Amino acid sequence: LAGSVFLVNLISHLLKEETMHIKKCFTAIFISSAFLSAGLVNSHAAEAPVQQQKVAKPNVVILATGGTIAGSAASNTQMTGYKAGALGIDVLLQAVPEIHKVANVKGEQISNIGSESMNNKIWLKLAKRINELLAKPDVDGIVITHGTDTLEETAYFLNLVTKSDKPVVIIGAMRPATAISADGPVNILNAVNLAASKDAKGRGVLIAMNDNINGARDVQKTNTLRVDTFQSPELGYLGYFENGRPVFYKATTRKHTIDTEFDVSNLNDLPRVDIIYSHVNDDGRMAEAAVANGAKGIVHAGTGNGSIHEAAEPALYDAAKKGIVVVRSARVPNGPTIESTAAWDKAGFVHAGTLNPQKARILLQLGLTKTNDPQKISEMFKQY
């Protein structure tokens, strides 16, 4: 009996040992399989090609208004006497396929006129469309094609009423699109580069012509024919283009775009403001005519530092007494118009600072949508 018990215990012990051995074997096999599987997965991951993530191109909208940049002439050597605003936006874009490498570009036709005929209606239509587009998250910048005659005025108007810090770039051309060395295509390419650039954000409305970058407030058309006509003689360029890449060296310090108080969203027209150009033998009759024809403001383009002919003073004093705001500017191209005689200050005449007459007129127009108080208007001229 004792032998039988011993035999049973021995067999039981051997079975337990075998079971433990089998468990260890299965554990080892499981762990090995896990490592092998991991190795295979890692091996496949290492062998898989690395896919580079595509960087989305910016979205730029080009708004066309006409001008020489869309002009057409009888021959490719004709640089004057052409028809401005003859070509549509689609034709302009087809001439510069390189822009599509820079951004996703769409075009819209706002108008197609020579810019000498620009008016308040088109200005307001353009401004409202710009604000509508820039409010969309998928629009990164705007380019406006425009005639050069009033380009500086449209640029400054938009600089005061655009409600976004996204880039807005305005361009034109001094030679028609049909010219043998038309300057429009490179201006379009540079403008798209600028509108697509994050460096252009928050700088106000910019002008991109002849490889230079000007600010809307200070830019002037300085020559009737040359392609380098747009300059900022008093305060200089903001930057330039280097192989299409915008390079900035300066920034404007006056308020613009999102920092202004002006809102044109509900406006259908702008107050009438006339410019009176002073000259020898000025007798004030032009100022009287402006008042008689409903002007709400007068910009006096005076001689020297905004000087007023003594024979014209009574007409301007009378206008001010009637609640018409009078701004003194200068017909001299450079230099500020500053405070002068006590009589002019007492009459409430506002001085334009470094704004030329045509830009002083724009600021006065917008100022009059808020107030006709000369003191408040004067503060605007110090800020903008």
Residue spans for each PLM region:
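Gram-negative bacterial Sec-dependent N-terminal signal peptides
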Residues: 22-41
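Internal gly/pro-rich beta-alpha loop/helix module
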Residues: 171-242
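Short, Lys/Arg-enriched N-terminal segments with co-localized hydrophobic residues
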Residues: 1-19
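C-terminal non-catalytic interaction/assembly regions of soluble proteins
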Residues: 305-384
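ATP/NTP phosphate-donor binding region
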Residues: 47-132, 314
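Short, acidic/small-residue loops that bind anionic groups at enzyme active sites
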Residues: 154-186, 193-196, 321-330
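Short Gly/Thr/Asp-enriched flexible loops that form oxyanion-binding sites at enzyme active sites
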Residues: 144-166, 308-317
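Accessory alpha-helical/coil subdomains and C-terminal extensions
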Residues: 57, 63, 67-70, 88, ...
